Amino acid sequence: MSVKPSAQTNDTIQSTSKSVPAASDSLVIGDAIYHLADHTPMMVQYLTMKANYPQALLLYRMGDFYELFFDDAKRAAQILDITLTRRGTDKAGNTIAMAGVPFHAADSYMARLIAAGQTVVVCEQIDESATGNARNTSNTPTMGDKQKKDKSKSAAGTIMRREVVKTLTAGTITDDALIAPNHTPTVVAIDILIPKSNSKQSLQAAISQMDLAAGTLTTQTLSANHDDIEGLKTQMLTVLARFAPSECIIGEALNDSIGGIGEDWLLWLRQSLDCPIIEVAANDFHRQHASATLCQQFGVQRLDGLGSGISDAPLAQSSCAALIHYARQTQQRQVPQINQLIVEYSDDYLIIDANSQQNLELFTPVSSNGTSLLSVLNHCQTPMGRRLLVQQMKRPLRQHSRINLRLDAIACLLKTDKTSIESNQASNQALKHSSLVISLREMLNSIGDIERISSRIGLMSAKPRDLRKLADGIASSTQLTTLLTDSGVSHEQAGLLPMLMQQLPAQLPAVQSIAKLIERAIITEPPAHIRDGGMLAAGYDDEFDRLTHLHDNIQVTLDEMVERARLESQLPSLKVGFNKVSGFYFELPKMQAKNAPAHFIRRQTLKSSERFITDELKDVETEYLSAQTLALTREKQLYHELLTELSSHLAELQQLSAAIAQIDVLSNWAQLAMTYNWQCPVMSNNDENKDSSNTDNQASIDISQGRHVVVEAALNPVNAGNAGNTVNSSNNSSNNSGTTRHNSHFVANDCALGSDANPERLLLITGPNMGGKSTYMRQTALIVLLAHCGSFVPAASAHIGDIDRIFTRIGSADDLAGGKSTFMVEMIETANILNQATNQSLVLMDEVGRGTATTDGLAIAHACVNRLLEIGCLTLFATHYFELTKLAQNPKESSGSNDKLIRNVHVAASEVDGQLLLLHQIKEGAASSSFGLHVAKMAGIPTQVLNDAKRYLVDNLTIDNLGIDNLSIDNLKSNNESANDDKNDLAKSVKDKRQQTADSDIEKLNLSNIKKTQNMTDIPQQNQLFSLQDELHAIDPDSLTPKQAHDLIYHLKKIISR
């Protein structure tokens, strides 16, 4: 979910409130009044159903089509780009607009309507005869024309019975054909308690999420001071960013005591969310009835029995109850698969708000051709695993014991692989067949979406192919146990992998019985749908077998019957036949007809023969003519009973699905670790040593040779492919922790804050544009995120302390629709950080203060640094305001009490032959220059413009013009030292024959910087020192006579004394 400021259009707002008749002979639906007397019985039936769903699109089944009428037809035609026609007029002469879609291709049309934010209500024909004629693929006799006419006459004058069978919404769909790839439909319900104006009671809100496919309800209660509405909204947006709902339901804005949201809050939600917002009946949120609804759903007497903390959270109860009501309404049945309730708290997870998620490009890239972190990481083999990985990234853990469980499991997989690889290398076996991780992933790739199939079983909507996929998945998951056991992992051991093995079929007899039942019931390649039958296997049911045998083998049955009659009656010329008028008959020649048995009933006399029928033959005829219908009815009944039986084991199926998903994610993390040479992080401040009430528990990070996941993968696409397939053996060597370059030539860098060796809380990062400051900051945040997800990290080593949130202020964007400039947007993000950050937060601030006057920008940046120091959070602060570097060199400049809170670092860069060379290395000290003109040249700025810029910089730009403090000589010396350090690094990377030239160029560059700085100061003492330096630089000592040298010394001493 993305949070956006623009208002939501009313077209996406759906309502389930029912219309009521305006009078006994008319209906009000929306803004229209329909007089029932003007319409045919069929249209009256349609309008009566439509009145219950005024804002939804009603798909009304008529034969082979789903039809839409009136405004629904116009709306659907516009969205689907289909023909808008008409179904004549009513008796008053009003045109009835109509549009339709074929029922056999309806899924694709429904998916498009749902994606457009519409609610789709499906109305089906219930009569069996309405589903079309039964199939007849043989050349055997069919029902006579006279019988068809008689049957059709019996139905004449009646209206086909129809019922609403399901309501499809963006958050409650479970059919794969309706769900976009890699998308998880969810619904959130929001309940808010606003205290009275004279009350000191805190503001409260509960946000609950329902994942119908996973069968989970997740809820979190938020609170803020009674007058801090903006604070509560900020918290809500953070939770909504984590939930990423497909739709949101709220109670109608009625009585707050019942549970409703005021119009102001509703408007704010519409402006903030990019999903449909649906108003439901306020009683669905009724706080007095919520407890009973939850107890009924979860089968407990009291909410205390759930043991999840829900009993003390009335708003969480009401919002969860509203979701259960909504699920039952949309699915038109009970929802037994919702059997897990999770209560979340802010301290459970590392919090990353929506802005930070976007700035770090976790799930979606900023640019259309960009790459998100998820796209690089997500190479899971099962649909459940891919969804679980997203959830783990949205919910990075803070509890170190849970993190270490995941890390230990990954280490176990890698350790097993390493042992196996060494053993197989010694025996000269192929590497690709020795890896446990690869074997697991190959097996996982054959497992279908058990989670969603289980959900559809609970909703009685699973299709025959779903069941076959389930049986095949169970068989494959059994092999997972074998692979792990053969690698030395036992379900009796401690750890996450043994726990997961206990949820695999080997330890769940009920799951094994499910697979056997499906194998016995469903054919190997069943049809896609049950409507035409043909999915049950022979031998599953005797009665079904008899009916299908009768229909499919009618000639055999007749042949057996006539042969038996010949023997019994001694009539060798007896034959059996069929015609459309009389049906089945026995036929005897005239000469033998007089010997016909008594039970033969004469039916027809021909010139040379007589035709007879018997009661047995009539029974066979009746059974045959109805056999296909009876077989299809019996097959559907048996299939329904099969789903009912399977639904009694939903809990075991959900356990299996969850275990497979976790194994998939763990093997995915292990594959990434092998491919990219990631290392296991060390999570410090373990839970047992942590005092949660102690606010002095400060965060810390100590990362050695860290890399940026996405950039490294982009620079090395071969490895990126291997991450999703096989192990890259070149990366299985020992860790090269001493180097700053890897296969992809990505330059690795250290980052340490708050550690024993580096106690500083803020890194002030300077350096040129394009040098890698933003990449360095982002990679630090991503390493911290991955560690809290329980993954190995792209670094030689990483020690991560107790971090509660990650904030970022990176990049630039405006909000034209919301009336906010780029600078305003950046200030809002900065304000959020300064108001929400704690001493356990990690904060990334990039170029704060740009976009306004330099004096204002520098002042804002200076104040922000001081505020961040007061908070004590870990901060990476990138800036081009070199004046800020004095805060680290002169601690008294800052308002902090600690003299070692700030450390200057810079991105190394140097100039060679007039060209800027970016080394991408983080070095101690402040940068000597931002090299803005060099970057402008690289971007293609015309030479004339660059020369003009240089002249302006040298001749006109002075510190006095800017109205800010002057650079100190000490700062200048530091800058020169940094430049010399970068020069030394550069000399190592260029050819020997150019080293002397490069040194000369860099020395000239430093002198140029000194002269530029001379022009940028107006302090007399500093001017005199620069003048003295110029004189010394101009002197040639070898050309001076002793007298001239003596006079020069007195001259210099006189200048210094002044």
UniProtKB/Swiss-Prot annotation:
Residues 720-740 have a biased composition (Low complexity). GO terms for molecular function: ATP binding; ATP-dependent DNA damage sensor activity; damaged DNA binding; mismatched DNA binding. Residues 130-142 have a biased composition (Polar residues). Pfam families: MutS_I, MutS_II, MutS_III, MutS_IV, MutS_V. NCBIfam families: PRK05399.1. The keyword S-adenosyl-L-methionine does not apply. ATP binds at G767, P768, N769, M770, G771, G772, K773, S774. This is DNA mismatch repair protein MutS. This protein is involved in the repair of mismatches in DNA. It is possible that it carries out the mismatch recognition step. This protein has a weak ATPase activity. The gene is mutS. InterPro entries: DNA_mismatch_repair_MutS, DNA_mismatch_repair_MutS-lik_N, DNA_mismatch_repair_MutS/MSH, DNA_mismatch_repair_MutS_C, DNA_mismatch_repair_MutS_clamp, DNA_mismatch_repair_MutS_core, DNA_mismatch_repair_MutS_N, DNA_mismatch_repair_MutS_sf. Residues 130-156, 720-742, 975-999 are annotated as: Disordered. PROSITE patterns: DNA_MISMATCH_REPAIR_2 (PS00486). It comes from Psychrobacter arcticus (strain DSM 17307 / VKM B-2377 / 273-4). Belongs to the DNA mismatch repair MutS family.
